[in-house]
Regions:
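Bacterial N-terminal signal peptides
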Residues: 33-42
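A ligand-binding cleft/hinge motif common to bilobed small-molecule-binding domains
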Residues: 117-122, 242, 247-265
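Conserved C-terminal helix/tail region of periplasmic/extracytoplasmic solute-binding proteins
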Residues: 340-370
Length: 370
């Protein structure tokens, strides 16, 4: 190539009656620089491709949830495999909608989501059917954490009654029925984004169940005067309880324990009918090119020590029954360490919930929130 350029430059000199030795030297230097850059890229590109290949992409909620997984299972996974974990964060439904648009070429390799929204992924063909033989630690899962052939529980919590005992003299909550007491008028808050908990409770108190939720409609309508507000997110829930504006809440247990840690004097109870069980789940995305790594990640998630650490950090229930939990954590209301404790809770079928959520939200907004 150098010789060809020199020849061309020589021809130029002949044609135009001048000499281009300096031009030849300059062009030779430029050519050598280009060749060096070319060979550098040739070496760097495979390394970059390898770097990209050695990443596992995990979709999860942001904030403390992302940090929870990063500091526990992702840390263990990277130490064992050398593979870096990259996170995509966002809201539950936003992430679902993005994966629908990317169907067949998923943005992530692994997704964490709620048990019922997981069914929306599965019904749309977005999750792989799990090969549990590749997740040996899953043998220790609680039965209630085995959500479907496509997604399984990562940890659990409850929605239950949390209240400010300092603002409610001599008030006790031993049953969900206590929310209907006349003295509760204008004191209760619940989530505006998911009424499934109180809908299921109302059906049970009416002698039915979530599948036949209509039988609890009159019961739930009778609770309407006792609602003061409906919170839109965790921060709003915290503000309503901390200020005392709503001294009673249908509250996420993990959120309540966070507030207690911030100095808000909340009492959390498990009614005699049981609290409403919630399970966050994990799944492998269909079309992922890192499925084998994804299975290793999920297996690391179910390591007994990792599950115990998650329980400690979030004050939630480990999904596996062999985790050794700090006794101070294990005794907290809403933290379950035995199969019997799991079974004592109100467990709304996740597939039913996925099918009914839109209908429930519409009915609740029209009949209770307006």
């Amino acid at each position: 190539m150098v010789q060809n350029i020199e020849a061309a430059c020589g021809e130029f000199a002949l044609r135009h009656g001048g000499c281009c030795e300096r031009g030849i030297r300059n062009m030779r230097r430029a050519l050598l620089a280009i060749l060096a850059l070319f060979f550098g890229l040739a070496i760097a590109l495979p390394a970059q491709a390898q770097d990209k290949q050695d990443k596992l992409v995990v979709s999860i909620w942001g904030g403390s949830w992302r940090d929870l997984v990063a500091e526990t299972v992702a840390k263990k996974f990277t130490a064992e495999t050398g593979v870096v974990v990259e996170f995509i964060t966002g809201g539950t439904i936003d992430r679902l909608n993005k994966e629908k648009l990317a169907k067949g070429n998923p943005e992530s390799d692994i997704t964490f989501t709620t048990s019922h929204v997981g069914w929306l992924y599965a019904n749309d063909g977005l999750f792989e059917t799990l090969d549990l033989a590749k997740i040996p630690n899953a043998k220790n899962l609680a039965d209630e954490a085995r959500i479907s052939p496509f997604h399984i529980g990562a940890w659990a919590y409850v929605y239950t009654i949390g209240y400010r005992a300092d603002l409610l003299a001599n008030m006790k909550f031993e049953s969900w029925n206590d929310l209907w007491k006349p003295e509760m008028k204008g004191k209760i808050a619940g989530p505006d984004f998911d009424p499934s908990h109180i809908i299921a409770v109302s059906a049970i108190l009416s002698g039915s169940d979530a599948a036949h939720w209509e039988k609890g409609q009159d019961k739930l309508k009778a609770l309407k005067p006792n609602f003061k507000a409906f919170y839109t997110n965790d921060a709003n829930s915290q503000q309503l309880l901390a200020s005392g504006e709503t001294p009673v809440q249908i509250v996420l247990s993990m959120n309540a324990y966070y507030m207690i840690g911030q100095g808000v004097p909340i009492t959390l109870v498990i009614p005699k009918e049981g609290a409403v069980l919630g399970v966050d789940t994990v799944a492998v995305m269909k079309g992922s090119k890192k499925a084998e790594l994804a299975y290793k990640f999920i297996n690391a998630l179910y390591d007994a020590d990792i599950q115990a650490e998650i329980a400690k950090l979030k004050k939630g229930s480990p999904a596996v029954l062999n985790a050794k939990i700090d006794p101070e954590i294990a005794k907290l209301p809403g933290v379950f360490t035995t199969a019997a404790q799991w079974k004592q809770q109100i467990n709304i079928d996740a597939k039913l919930r996925a099918e009914k959520t839109a209908e429930w939200r519409k009915w609740f907004a029209e009949n209770i929130m307006n």
